[in-house]
């Protein structure tokens, strides 16, 4: 719980007013209480009482976080976790060494480089002692990357007055066998710094792509099944670790508001196998659109990038060892005593201790001491054992957080309690030494990094490619753990048909996930303008035939004014995210379909029916 000074000042003012009243009734105490030059000892006493009563009053008015935290940790634990720093990693394959596709798997650990590099020098200076070797910032690659023996050479806009055309020219490594070149592994990222261009390209790729052809060696290869599939909505595209009991629609909404760049990816699909006789050193992918590209769009060679993937500042770590003592209510979780500012806790994964036991070995005839691992169960889980209230023996661990008074973020503690919240007896703890496995971040250190600082790896990396971060790491975002916001979030999780009848209800749900708006006043104003642009939400039941079977679902029409958005493409991306999220409101064996209407131009975009995910019971 974060200490709020207003409670202290209100209580101190109340005590001073009472002092004046008391001095009026008892004049012999006036020189201690009512006079301006009061006794300093009395003044310190009043301030101390005001501090204690202010804390007590704040605790009474804190909206029962002990209850809401437990519910949210079970229903949606990521809301009480910080959103770590995120960035984009680009690989550059060595064309002289790459002849076949090479996979860079997700979960690859990337760091700020070798000792003495510029990135690590910044971190050592940040730690306060340039002679200390600060631990590097560690990022985890969130998606697979396929490296192919091709490079993107040129992107050209060849639109006509009636149709849009984009030519993407690729250079091929010498000696490449076209028979083994699977171009369906190509993934594009809209990497232009111009938000207008990248959002408009997103709209054109999703809505107006009409066809494509491959041109190489003077011949054109038609591709009737070609499509560009938007990336970021499937479970394998997740950036944040996501529990299995929580629907991915919440993840999509949270990641969109925290890092929209992770959704600007497209997979090339439907490219046929190339003829074996091709021996070209380049080829061109021509994309045809049903309408010309906007006149003010600016296509450059970096408007499309290959071999990119988002990375997140998350890694496995162990906390300092804890010795259990039955007289303590909780224990501080410290990832590192030497570099406390370099680590922050994202989640507690497991709690394990070593227990000793004696047994008599038959061949020796004497007791032998053995050690076994004891895995402590989590309190906020669905694995509680049935016990009588007077004979409780199972001890659970509980991760507790409160807003830190000394730095941004939280202070973390670990408590060992019974199922009813009571403290266990000393015999159940046995002064054991506990090892706590964590998932950690580097707190705010990645903000000090610049593009090109992340170039190292903790394990084996493909020798055929180098890599670097091409965007500056974002600032981590901590959740709000006090106040009425949690009750609003729990209300939003109570999904039902009535939630789709009111635009204000949808705005409240969206606001709960927009963590940038919570921390930054400027982003809050921009977010509020976009929420105000949602004018109407109309939802009606509809019937559709799926494989000849009639199915009833929900159809929602969202009317949005385009003024606060960069362009129509940004509106379309928001609609794509909401299409995945709103499928939560349709029950199993049902569906939901979304239509977004631009209230200024009356243009509309419709998304395909999405199967419902809300259980009936």
Where are these regions (language model features)?
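Residues at beta-strand starts and edge strands
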Residues: 83-87, 162-166, 182-184, 208, ...
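Mixed-charge (acidic/basic) macromolecular-recognition segments
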Residues: 1-24, 33-36, 227-232, 236-276, ...
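Extracellular ectodomain segments of secreted/surface proteins
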Residues: 41, 53-60, 78, 152-163, ...
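Short, low-complexity Pro/Thr/Gly
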Residues: 175-394
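Short linear motifs embedded in intrinsically disordered, proline/glycine-rich low-complexity segments
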Residues: 52-59, 70-79, 84-100, 114-115, ...
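C-terminal domain/tail detector
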Residues: 28, 361-617
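Extended assembly-interface regions of large multimeric machines
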Residues: 1-220
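Short, Φ-rich (hydrophobic/aromatic) sequence segments
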Residues: 41, 45-49, 71, 205, ...
């Amino acid at each position: 719980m974060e200490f709020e000074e207003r409670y202290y000042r209100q209580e101190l003012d109340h005590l001073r007013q009472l002092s004046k009243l008391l001095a009026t009734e008892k004049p012999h105490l006036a020189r201690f209480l009512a006079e301006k030059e009061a006794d300093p000892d009395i003044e310190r006493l009043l301030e101390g009482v005001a501090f204690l009563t202010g804390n007590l009053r704040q605790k009474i008015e804190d909206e029962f976080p002990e209850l809401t935290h437990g519910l949210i940790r079970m229903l949606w634990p990521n809301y009480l976790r910080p959103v770590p720093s995120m960035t984009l990693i680009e690989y550059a394959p060595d064309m002289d060494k790459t002849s076949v596709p090479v996979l860079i798997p997700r979960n690859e650990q990337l760091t700020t480089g070798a000792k003495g590099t510029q990135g690590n020098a910044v971190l050592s200076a940040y730690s306060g002692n340039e002679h200390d070797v600060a631990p590097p910032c560690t990022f985890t690659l969130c998606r697979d990357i396929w490296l192919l023996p091709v490079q993107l050479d040129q992107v050209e806009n060849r639109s006509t007055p009636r149709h849009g055309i984009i030519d993407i020219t690729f250079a091929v490594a010498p000696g490449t066998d076209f028979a083994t070149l699977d171009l369906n592994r190509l993934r594009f990222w809209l990497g232009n710094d111009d938000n207008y261009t990248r959002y408009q390209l997103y709209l054109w790729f999703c809505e107006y792509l009409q066809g494509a052809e491959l041109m190489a060696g003077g011949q054109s290869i038609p591709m009737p099944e070609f499509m560009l599939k938007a990336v970021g909505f499937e479970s394998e595209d997740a950036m944040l670790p996501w529990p299995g009991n929580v629907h991915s629609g919440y993840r999509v909404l949270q990641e969109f508001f925290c890092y929209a760049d992770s959704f600007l990816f497209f997979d090339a699909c439907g490219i046929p196998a190339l003829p074996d006789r091709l021996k070209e050193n380049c080829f061109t992918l021509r994309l045809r659109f049903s309408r010309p590209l906007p006149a003010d769009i600016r296509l450059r060679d970096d408007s499309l990038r290959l071999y990119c993937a988002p990375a997140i500042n998350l890694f496995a770590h162990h906390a300092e060892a804890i010795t259990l003592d039955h007289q303590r209510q909780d224990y501080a979780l410290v990832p590192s005593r030497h570099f406390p500012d370099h680590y922050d806790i994202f989640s507690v994964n497991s709690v394990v201790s070593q227990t000793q036991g004696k047994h008599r070995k038959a061949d020796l005839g004497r007791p032998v001491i053995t050690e076994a691992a004891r895995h402590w169960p989590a309190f906020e889980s669905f694995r509680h054992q049935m016990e009588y209230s007077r004979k409780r023996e199972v001890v659970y661990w509980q991760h507790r957080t409160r807003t830190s008074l000394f730095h941004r973020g939280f202070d973390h503690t670990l408590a060992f309690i019974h199922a009813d919240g009571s403290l266990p007896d000393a015999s159940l703890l046995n002064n054991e030494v506990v090892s706590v496995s964590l998932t950690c971040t580097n707190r705010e250190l990645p903000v000090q990094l610049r593009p090109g600082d992340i170039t190292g790896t903790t394990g084996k990396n493909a020798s055929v490619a180098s890599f670097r971060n091409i965007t500056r790491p974002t600032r981590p975002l901590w959740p709000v753990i006090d106040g009425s916001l949690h009750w609003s979030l729990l209300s939003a999780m109570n999904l039902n048909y009535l939630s789709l009848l009111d635009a204000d209800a949808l705005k409240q749900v969206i606001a709960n996930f927009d963590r940038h708006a919570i921390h930054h006043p400027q982003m809050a104003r921009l977010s509020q303008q976009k929420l105000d642009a949602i004018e109407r939400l109309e939802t009606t039941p509809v019937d559709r035939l799926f494989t000849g079977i009639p199915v009833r679902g929900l159809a929602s029409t969202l009317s949005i004014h385009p003024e606060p958005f960069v362009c129509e493409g940004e509106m379309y991306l928001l609609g794509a995210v909401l299409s995945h999220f709103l499928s939560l409101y349709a029950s199993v064996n049902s569906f939901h379909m979304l239509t977004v209407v631009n209230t200024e131009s009356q243009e509309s975009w419709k998304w395909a029916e999405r199967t419902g995910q809300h259980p009936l019971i």
